[in-house]
Amino acid sequence: MQLGIDFGKTNSSVAHYDGQALRSVVLDPGNENPTLLPSLIWIDRDYSVRLGSAAAIEYLEKETGRRTVWSRRELEPIEIIVAGAVVKGLGDSEPIHYWHDVHIVTDVNANGRLLQSIKTSLRDPRYEGTVIFDRTYTVDELIALQLVEMRQQAERQ
């Protein structure tokens, strides 16, 4: 099977070439344009995944109008090192070290998490992934969710 993939930041599409003709693959039947898969991933508390318009619908159904419950969790302090000041006639001073308290605030009442711009993270080599309900997802895993679905849709048509 020969596939061409447009893996865009907002939407993705796939075309199949059978040796004679090129045709678009239906990726998201619920989308206004079913040959486009919006770059949305919804992961719920059971780690079930929805992609594209189904992710948006799931998010709206589960998260709209619900009560938010914020929880603050303290993390380990981080050390920050900055360059020292340059004083005329005295030369460079030593670097300045200080510690900063870090915390995260989480909506513990959330039913799931909607990821909207995961492809944008591909250009940042420091971004390794995200934690969703105590499970770490690497960027590779999140991208694979979309690519595998696109391939499977193409194989079914």
Which residues does each predicted region cover?
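Gly/Thr-rich phosphate-binding beta-strand-loop-beta motif of the actin/hexokinase/Hsp70
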Residues: M1-S24
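Phosphate-binding loop and its immediate beta->loop->alpha context
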Residues: L27-Q157
